[in-house]
């Protein structure tokens, strides 16, 4: 008997919607990354994108534990000399709440072309409205 290897054209991808209200950021991101990779499926193959599409709503209501709301810092660079910027978790939630979940999940995915393809299947929205109703996403309770 040979080892099963999934083929990209035969992978069945489902759509799921996840409500981030009150969920802990790291625990939520871990499960999202796992499902984007497809590790929850029996047909998981490391070099093939077998994951599902995931729509995250209410990203602005995601929670962190302890003092991370004020102590956790996000850094980025503008590209100019001396252009290093930083913002706390609280400031990031106020400015761009989707980025908090996107950054957390992106760090948990493989680096390279396959990881970027997996990341493109993650859709994050700050509010409760999303524009993927045509895909009929199933509610996923994490």
Curated annotation (Swiss-Prot):
Record's keyword annotation contains Transcription regulation: no
Record's keyword annotation contains Ribonucleoprotein: yes
Biological process annotations from GO: negative regulation of translation; translation
Keywords assigned: Ribonucleoprotein, Ribosomal protein
GO MF term list: mRNA binding; structural constituent of ribosome
PROSITE patterns reported in the protein's UniProt record: RIBOSOMAL_L13
InterPro entries associated with the record: Ribosomal_uL13, Ribosomal_uL13_bac-type, Ribosomal_uL13_CS, Ribosomal_uL13_sf
GO cellular component, as recorded: cytosolic large ribosomal subunit
Superkingdom to which the source organism belongs: Bacteria
Family: Belongs to the universal ribosomal protein uL13 family.
Subunit structure: Part of the 50S ribosomal subunit.
Function: This protein is one of the early assembly proteins of the 50S ribosomal subunit, although it is not seen to bind rRNA by itself. It is important during the early stages of 50S assembly.
Protein name: Large ribosomal subunit protein uL13
Organism whose genome encodes this protein: Histophilus somni (strain 129Pt)
């Amino acid at each position: 008997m040979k080892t099963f290897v999934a083929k990209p054209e035969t992978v069945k991808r489902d759509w799921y919607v996840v409500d981030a209200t009150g969920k802990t950021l790291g625990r939520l991101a871990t499960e999202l990354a796992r499902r984007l990779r497809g590790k929850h499926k029996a047909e998981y193959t490391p070099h093939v994108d077998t994951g599902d599409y995931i729509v995250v709503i209410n990203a602005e209501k995601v929670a962190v534990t302890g003092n991370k709301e004020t102590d956790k810092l996000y850094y980025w660079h503008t590209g100019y000399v001396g252009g290093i910027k930083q913002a706390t978790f609280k400031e990031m939630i106020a400015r761009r709440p989707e980025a908090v979940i996107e950054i957390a999940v992106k760090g948990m995915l493989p680096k390279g072309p396959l990881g970027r393809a997996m990341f493109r299947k993650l859709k994050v929205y700050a509010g409760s409205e999303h524009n993927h109703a045509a895909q009929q996403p199933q509610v996923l309770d994490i």
